[in-house]
Amino acid sequence: MNLHEYQAKQLFAEFGLPVPEGYACDTPQEAFEAAGRISTAKKVVKCQVHAGGRGKAGGVELHDTKEGVKEFAQKWLGKNLVTYQTDANGQPVTKILVEEASNIANELYLGAVVDRASRKIVFMASTEGGVEIEKVAEETPELIHKAAIDPLVGPQAYQGRELAFKLGLEGDQIKQFVKIFMGLGTMFSQYDLALLEINPLVITAEGNLLCLDGKINIDSNALYRQPKLREMHDPSQEDEREAHAAQWELNYVALDGNVGCMVNGAGLAMGTMDIVNLHGGKPANFLDVGGGATKERVAEAFKIILSDDNVKAVLVNIFGGIVRCDMIAEGIIGAVKEVGVSVPVVVRLEGTNADLGREVLANSDVDIIAAESLTDAAQKVVAAAEAK
């Protein structure tokens, strides 16, 4: 689960991290009043969406007057912001962050992720702030400095000092950086974060460190024990189909192709998408129905897939392990009848009672195309989509 910038900064402030004075606003009038409370001559106004690239898309501006801030809010609130990280529809803007402007002397990067290989939290720091860290890692990896935190021990001050030295910080800046590092390390573990970024972490003209931006991603599997963070969830930033799928414990990700995919198992789902691509098709989605491919869940999966008007055919690829293929076949038939599927459906069954499952499909009165293999299934569904 992602947080907005203003929410991330609220958490930063709780852990004693320096953040600009700012106010999250729901209306143009609130933005106008917030600008009046900020003492700096210039105010920064930012659209709050779960996507990067806001500045280049016009979602971040600098204004001298309260009226300018209000006009920005009037322009964006209730509209969608399209960036390079969103789809063509963009993300809805429901809040505007109004902040004091900062005198920036230098920009740094500070972030943290869970390293599954070492089972530790790895902090990354760089002098190349304000740009995508992926680009820095690719072009100049030597400029990224790391510190691994043992979750049983927690962040250590010496690790923060080492990073500060490598960033070229001096004097009181080192103390400030260590405080930020220690706070973030504690926050990361306490709130079950999966990713944390401050980009940029700036050095102001006065020589102080300031968290100018914030990005937080929380491990969704840990939300059951993070009630405070659950309340920060913004459903407006999610694809409607993905949100509906989550209610049925279906893992769904919308894509831009025309072949709907319904599979049990994330690895098999990715393999299915690959082979559809290999045979000239374009997947319309990733959908993992999991181990419980019941009639009800399959029916909901069909509804979600077919809510995308671009879908011209559906490939159902099921491996029967604990669940028998004949039972799955009956569930598919029932779901197709219930939903009233109007596009070609190709089904490939493999595993326990696979032959019996294919026989059940063949003897049904539902128009389902049975496939003998994964390659056969991909070829048939691509051909069906092209003919539609």
Curated annotation (Swiss-Prot):
It comes from the Bacteria. The gene is sucC. One of its GO terms (biological process) is succinyl-CoA metabolic process. Heterotetramer of two alpha and two beta subunits. Succinyl-CoA synthetase functions in the citric acid cycle (TCA), coupling the hydrolysis of succinyl-CoA to the synthesis of either ATP or GTP and thus represents the only step of substrate-level phosphorylation in the TCA. The beta subunit provides nucleotide specificity of the enzyme and binds the substrate succinate, while the binding sites for coenzyme A and phosphate are found in the alpha subunit. It catalyses: succinate + ATP + CoA = succinyl-CoA + ADP + phosphate; GTP + succinate + CoA = succinyl-CoA + GDP + phosphate. Substrate binds at N264, G321, I322, V323. Residues 9-244 form the ATP-grasp domain. Its EC number is 6.2.1.5. ATP binds at K46, G53, R54, G55, E99, S102, E107. This is Succinate--CoA ligase [ADP-forming] subunit beta. Mg(2+) binds at N199, D213. Belongs to the succinate/malate CoA ligase beta subunit family. One of its GO terms (cellular component) is cytosol. It holds the Pfam family ATP-grasp_2. It is an enzyme of class 6 (ligase). InterPro entries: ATP-grasp, ATP-grasp_succ-CoA_synth-type, ATP_grasp_subdomain_1, Succ-CoA_synthase_bsu_CS, SUCC_ACL_C, Succ_CoA_ligase-like_bsu, Succinyl-CoA_synth-like. NCBIfam families: PRK00696.1 (NF001913), sucCoAbeta (TIGR01016). Pathway: Carbohydrate metabolism; tricarboxylic acid cycle; succinate from succinyl-CoA (ligase route): step 1/1. It comes from Vibrio parahaemolyticus serotype O3:K6 (strain RIMD 2210633). Binds 1 Mg(2+) ion per subunit. One of its GO terms (molecular function) is succinate-CoA ligase (ADP-forming) activity. Keywords: ATP-binding, Ligase, Magnesium, Metal-binding, Nucleotide-binding, Tricarboxylic acid cycle.
